[in-house]
């Protein structure tokens, strides 16, 4: 996804910079772990392929400390943060960001504005709707994205240890190009692995994370089984409708032949309504549900001890709105050369890719504005 803009070599360099930054602000950088398989093991064939590229694990335990250290550094360098402030609109034509305080005591006050020379619009998942509002308002040309939907699979780690020894964050995949469908395992967590609930648009979906602190060790493995489905007319609306239909009693679903939902790292039950059969899920997902179940059945062949010792949390989803067309040199909008879309605004999947996109944009902006400087080391320092 990043390499289409800047090529494979540059994409890897940018992602290395992201990891370097995480290590820089990590309280224990030596605990950042890399999984980098070099060859596909024979025992997964012919059922699956294994994606061969490095994956880094920072550790959920440390994210708040990393964020605090990073924040303190940015403040020390003069970066201003506007807390408890909502951006209500952006005028791309007049270079104006319009915002309003969400503090109750300021509720009746007028909007405030910030004017910009260059704007990096880098929202997360909660900002997808706002990004789409802007895209619609300014009639930004775009290209449709695929549907990304599936389940969060969980089982005792012992069943997958043979593959974990090859690749901690293994990514099994298979493709059905004639059907426009591909599947992959996604975001594997081991050792102290927990399923997490995400709430978006009022609906529950699932993800996973792993603790580094071995006090949390539960010897479980969880990962997403995600389908990438092409050819659906409105992928974003389709995904939201399917996720909404897969809710019951205000939460998502859980199915297992033998197990019950696990607990969170805090010792609470993972919010999910347990169902005793999958007929309702199949009715909602239609023919696509067969791909998920075939994936699980073939895992039982590759990992023979697995059998019925597993459970799935339904659904896992990655909402991808249409991707605005941007200039490849700096991810600026084709209609507004000083507005750069990054992260979920550009349908990025994952924090590493989002961070790499931001660095890519920052490098270009700094190189342009400092192109006439007499101090090339200044550019070198701040671009790095």
Model regions: which residues?
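N-terminal FAD cofactor-binding segment of flavoenzymes
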Residues: 1-39
